[in-house]
Amino acid sequence: MAVNDVNVFYGAKQAIKNVGLDIVAREVTAFIGPSGCGKSTFLRCLNRMNDTIDICKVTGDIRLDGEDVYDRHIDVVELRARVGMVFQKPNPFPKSIYENIAYGPRIHGIARGKSELDEIVQSSLERAGLWEEVKDRLESPGTGLSGGQQQRVCIARAIAVSPEVILMDEPCSALDPIATAKIEELIDELRSNYTIVIVTHSMQQAARVSQRTAFFHLGRLIECGDTETIFTNPQHNLTQGYITGRFG
C-alpha cells in the first residue's frame, strides 16, 4: 500500500496531518506512539473503517496495488475483504466457530460448495493456529472460547476471505501474556503470506514482531523506517524521547 498526504478530520478537529508512507508487502509494520496520537485513526483509513463515522472526512491518497481505495467506484465490502481488520477486543460473531469462519467466504461467493467451504474453514483455523484446539467442537459458540482463542478466531475469519493486508488494532491489549505470545508467534508466521499492519502501545511488542516501525505524535508521522534503526538509532528527537520513556 502507498499513502500520500493523508489528512483526517472529525468535524473541525484535525486528527491526522499530512501523513505519507509506503507499507511494504509481506512485512509487519508497527504503528507506535502515545495515546491519542492518531495511530488507530490512521490504521482505520486504510480500509475505510472511518466511513462509519458521519463527521469523519479523509483527504489524500491511499492506494492498494495502485488503486485509489477512496475512489467512488470502489466496492467497500470488497475492499474490506482485501484489507481485513482485527480489533482490540476479540469480537467473534454470536455463531458457531464454524460459521464465524464460513460466513465471509459464503457471502463473497468464494466457496462453490460445502466441501470447499469445509476446506476453507479448516485451512483458516490451521493458519490461525487454532484447528487442533477446536476441530472437535466446530459447532460450539465462538463466544465460548477463551479470549486468546477468540482473537485467533477473528484472525482466521479475516484469513478466510484471502486478504492481501491484515490490519490489527492492538490485538493483544485484552489478552494475558500466554495468549499474547501465541498471537505474536502467529503474526510472525502469517507475514510470509500477508502484509500486516499492527497498532501497539507496547514498544517491546513492536520490536519483537515488526520489520518496520512508524512513530506517530499529535497526528503526525514523525519517523518511519526499519524497526531496528527506529529503536537503536532514531533520527528525530521526539522518537528518541518516546523510545527512551521520557514521555508516553
UniProtKB/Swiss-Prot annotation:
Which segment of the chain is annotated as a signal peptide?
none
InterPro entries annotated for this entry?
AAA+_ATPase, ABC_transporter-like_ATP-bd, ABC_transporter-like_CS, P-loop_NTPase, PstB-like
For biological process, the GO terms are: phosphate ion transmembrane transport
Where does the ABC transporter domain start and stop, copy by copy? Answer: 1-243
According to the entry, what is the taxonomic lineage of the organism?
Answer: Bacteria, Pseudomonadati, Pseudomonadota, Alphaproteobacteria, Rhodospirillales
Q: Which PANTHER family match?
A: ABC TRANSPORTER I FAMILY MEMBER 17
- Indicate what this protein is called per its UniProt record: Phosphate import ATP-binding protein PstB
Q: Which gene encodes it?
A: pstB
Subcellular localization is given as: Cell inner membrane
